[in-house]
Design a protein with these regions (language model features):
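Cysteine-nucleophile active-site neighborhood
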Residues: 65-136
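Short, well-ordered coil/turn elements that cap or connect secondary structure elements
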Residues: 3, 33-35, 93, 146, ...
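Flexible, glycine-rich phosphate/dinucleotide-binding loops
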Residues: 17, 47, 67, 107, ...
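Hydrophobic/aromatic beta-strand patches that form the interior of the parallel beta-sheet core
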Residues: 9, 39-41, 59, 99, ...
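Short loop/helix-cap segments at secondary-structure boundaries that form the rim of catalytic
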Residues: 49-53, 109, 164-167
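Pocket-forming structural segment of enzyme catalytic cores
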Residues: 113-211
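Short, solvent-exposed loop/turn segments that connect beta-strands within catalytic domains
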Residues: 2-4, 91-94, 183-186
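N-terminal beta1-alpha1 cap of cysteine-dependent amidohydrolase-like domains
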Residues: 1-88, 211-214, 220, 225-276
Length: 276
């Protein structure tokens, strides 16, 4: 590892549970392996967090359980870590970039006081439409994606009831919402937030690929639960969505790569200016 290397910290929030998210994230990072190196930190099981000054880019994963609960140790240290990154960005020219996914996204929304987090009436799991907001139409995270686009959704909790005064105060923006459901009266959940120029988060799983989705369906209990919720026809439709190159493949190849390219370019550009 040289001084010129871009260092990425993956904050593993899965609490030791088997998952496909880590494999998918590492696969995407490896597409940039000529520029970056990474290390995994087991946040919830071992309370591992990186030193702020040692890494440049942070990806905080999805994970199981209630995002409003922790053990009073790892969760408080995690929130303090987020604050330390924010403080760093206020005081230093070379910025730290962070992506929050699913469980981490919900925790970040809570920490920043932007919205309510509550339990859904039923689990959301599958290939879902995601709609860009007006702000999302021009957000660089989504460059190359249509509107709406498709993503893998897997959540028991949701982010709703945005506190718009807090969004304005912090300069945060809602950049996508869940699918439009004309047949129900429930509020559309927030699917992504631009917390700042350097922090962004998604409720859905931008790392997911068809392999990860199929791996989840190998769990008989989960597969039967999805069929019970959606019916066999919609279940078959979801399987067809997996093979559509303009759906999950497109999202996997776009969002995290965009995040990494933006972060890497910003860091290298600033380093070059400072070295002159």
């Amino acid at each position: 590892m040289t001084d010129a290397t871009i260092r990425i910290a993956i904050l593993d929030m899965y609490n030791g549970e088997p998952n496909q998210g880590m494999r998918c994230i590492i696969d995407i990072i490896n597409r940039f392996n000529h520029l970056v190196e990474f290390k995994v930190f087991d946040v919830r099981r071992h309370c591992e967090l990186p030193e702020v000054n040692k890494y440049d880019i942070y990806i905080s994963t999805g994970g199981p359980g209630n995002p409003l609960e922790g053990d009073g140790n790892w969760d408080l240290k995690y929130y303090a870590f987020i604050d330390a990154l924010s403080q760093w960005n206020q005081e230093n020219a070379v910025k730290k970039h962070m992506l929050f996914i699913c469980h981490s996204f919900q925790m970040a929304c809570k920490h920043f006081g932007l919205a309510e987090i509550n339990k859904r009436r039923q689990t959301s799991f599958g290939v879902m439409k995601v709609h860009k907001t007006e702000e999302g139409l021009t957000d660089p995270l989504y460059d190359g994606l249509p509107d709406p686009f498709y993503a893998v959704d897997s959540r028991d909790y949701q982010v709703v009831q945005p506190k718009l005064s807090m969004f304005r105060k912090k300069g945060a923006k809602i950049i996508s919402l869940e699918k439009i459901r004309d047949h129900v009266q429930y509020e559309r959940a927030i699917m992504a937030v631009r917390f700042s120029e350097y922090f962004v988060g998604t409720q859905f799983h931008p790392e997911a690929d068809p392999i990860s989705y199929i791996a989840n369906l190998k769990n008989k209990e989960r597969r039967e639960k999805i069929i019970e919720m959606k019916g066999k026809i919609k279940f078959r439709d979801m399987l067809e969505d997996l093979l559509d190159e303009d759906k999950i493949y497109k999202t996997n190849e776009t969002i995290i790569p965009n995040f990494l390219r933006i972060a890497i370019n910003d860091i290298l550009k600033t380093r070059k200016i400072l070295s002159n």
